[in-house]
Amino acid sequence: MELQRLALRQQRSVAVDYEYRAVPLFMQAERLLRSGAVGTPWLVKLDWLMSSRADASRGWSWYSDRKAGGGVIGALGTHAFDTLAWLIGPVGAVQALNSVSIPERPGPDGAMTAVDAEDVALIQTTLSWQGRSDCSVPAQVNLASVARNGRGCWLEVYGSKGTLILGSENQKDYVHGFSLWLASSGEPLRSIQADADLAFPTTWSDGRVAPVARIQGWWAESMRSGQPMIPGLMEGVASRLACDAAASN
């Protein structure tokens, strides 16, 4: 909050790197949801099951230390909460069941060092559809960094008029590999491509580069125009508060 006040006082534009807002298929999903493609959401489910920390021989680091910001909530949860707030609406009360599956890892000196940062988090919350206080959508978020052969990142939105699914099984890249499907009531899922105006002009082997470059472009435009940067500190604070609530359970 102090950073927000400082930025406003000094008329500075501040960006937060929530790069999924800049990924074409995520932007397409947002466009579809806003247009009413699934009607009013009734249930939202997000599974983000990765294997990056499943090897118990992987060394202890800041990621293993809760006080240093480690854990799956800080790594994946911050993006998950922001994505849900952007696509559906503000995050409400949060309840979580957190677990440390690998309680020790080899430290720099070779000795086993205790791990207190969660590597599994099962989270329940509500989302205010398009910010409406009279339309609360139940949401389930499952995060893991120790899921061997995990299914990757999958978002499912079930609504009054249809279903939207956005997902990727890619365990090596957090951006490449996503696909999007949509089904109207009574119809099978069909694959959806991103609209041409959402495509990246250039892509790289590391999938993170293109969306980060797009975020930087938005940031530069914010500085030129004087308009607020989104995602910025306000979005960062909202996600951080949700993460703190989940981690405190």
Model-derived features: positions:
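Aromatic/hydrophobic pocket-lining residues that form π-stacking "cages" and hydrophobic walls in ligand
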Residues: 3, 29, 245-246
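Predominantly a Rossmann-like dinucleotide-binding segment in NAD(P)-dependent oxidoreductases
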Residues: 10-15, 20-115
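Beta-loop-alpha module in the N-terminal Rossmann-like domain of NAD(P)-dependent dehydrogenases
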Residues: 1-6, 213
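Contiguous beta-strand/loop segments that form the cofactor/metal-binding neighborhood of enzyme cores
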Residues: 81-176, 213-225, 244
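C-terminal "lid/loop" region of Rossmann-like NAD(P)-dependent oxidoreductases
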Residues: 191-207
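C-terminal helix-rich "cap/oligomerization" subdomain common to oxidoreductases
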Residues: 9, 13, 34, 132, ...
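A short glycine-threonine-serine/GTX helix/turn-capping micro-motif
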Residues: 68-74, 202-210
